[in-house]
Amino acid sequence: MTAALVDRALSIGADPRESADERFRRRLLVGVALIILPFGFVWGCLYWAIGEHAVALTPWAYVTGSAISLAVFARTRNFATLRTAQQVLILVAPALGTIMLGGLDESSSVILWCLFAPLGAVAFDRPGRAWPW
């Protein structure tokens, strides 16, 4: 039952015409996005618990944006839109969090999460697309 549920979740936006490589990339990105959702929510709760209420909105906005992009992808099956939305979210959320926390000293290594944007471009698109990120 669990395997069937996971397979169904990873089949969001499935297109019967996609190649095996496209299917793998789609399922991987959907899986990564779904796994990060609860972590982003908990991350926001931790900021809230330590009194950083404004900063808590950053990971919660990431979770909301990610969920919306997944819902849009489920309807439109436009992988490029999902990929771009996820890359923008993973680039902007940590940068905003770092700024809101007062810079690099106060935010520790939160900014390092931004490195996932170019890595995502390599993994889910083609390597040449990593440079703009």
Annotate the PLM regions.
Residues 1-22:
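Short, Lys/Arg-rich, polar N-terminal cytosolic tail immediately upstream
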Residues 15-19, 78, 102-103, 128-129:
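Intrinsic-disorder/low-complexity, polar/charged segments
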Residues 28-106, 110-120, 133:
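Hydrophobic transmembrane alpha-helices and their membrane-interface boundaries in multi-pass
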Residues 124-133:
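The cytoplasmic-loop to transmembrane-helix boundary for the fourth helix
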